[in-house]
Design a protein with these regions (language model features):
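Generic detector of well-ordered alpha-helical packing
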Residues: 1, 16, 41-42
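Conserved alpha-helix/loop element of class I SAM-dependent methyltransferases that forms part
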Residues: 1-11
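Active-site signature of alpha/beta-hydrolase-fold catalytic machinery across serine-
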Residues: 3, 26-29
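Conserved class I S-adenosyl-L-methionine
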Residues: 10-19
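Short, composition-biased local secondary-structure segments
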Residues: 18-20, 87-88
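Glycine-rich SAM-binding Motif I of class I
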Residues: 21-25
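S-adenosylmethionine
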Residues: 31-153
């Protein structure tokens, strides 16, 4: 979960489809100066996330029970992170509106997602694809960094 840490931008981070809190909870622990919103649609998982947040006394974590496509925060996020939430096109449709102009959407993937990268991304472009090294794991992991088509890459 911490392999994405070097790629975070800004103060406001969203973890979409947070599930059991990965990568949001570990990132919030090591990045106390940033605010994390854990967005999860399942009530039972949200109650678990709230319990973990309270037990760890993470003042920088907000748990939001909502589907990403239905959530409209007052202020959009500098970085939106998603792990295991399906194809890039669907992720962009569901969570793209949560990203502030100039922000990034980081999609954690397994094998290099060649087919997904070749698909139309409707107003988005690939800023970078980072190969991730996960200690103790020999399998491929990649982080796809997306930005709006009109944003500068860099």
């Amino acid at each position: 979960s911490l392999t994405v840490q070097p790629h975070l931008r800004g103060e406001r981070i969203a973890d979409v489809g947070s599930g059991a809190g990965f990568p949001g909870i570990p990132l919030a622990i090591v990045e106390p100066q940033r605010h994390f919103s854990l967005i999860e649609s399942t009530g039972k998982k949200c109650r678990f996330l709230e319990h973990v947040r309270d037990e760890l006394q993470l003042k920088n974590v907000e748990v939001v029970q909502s589907r990403a496509e239905n959530y409209r925060p007052e202020v959009r996020f500098d970085t939106v992170v998603a792990r295991a939430v399906g194809p890039l096109a669907g992720l962009l449709k569901a969570a793209g509106a949560l990203v502030v102009g100039g922000g990034r959407l980081l999609a954690m993937k397994g094998r290099y997602p060649q087919d997904e990268l070749a698909a139309r991304l409707n107003g988005w472009k690939v800023a970078a694809v980072h190969r991730l090294s996960v200690p103790g794991l020999d399998e491929e992991r990649h982080l796809v960094e997306l930005c709006r088509s009109h944003d500068r890459v860099g």
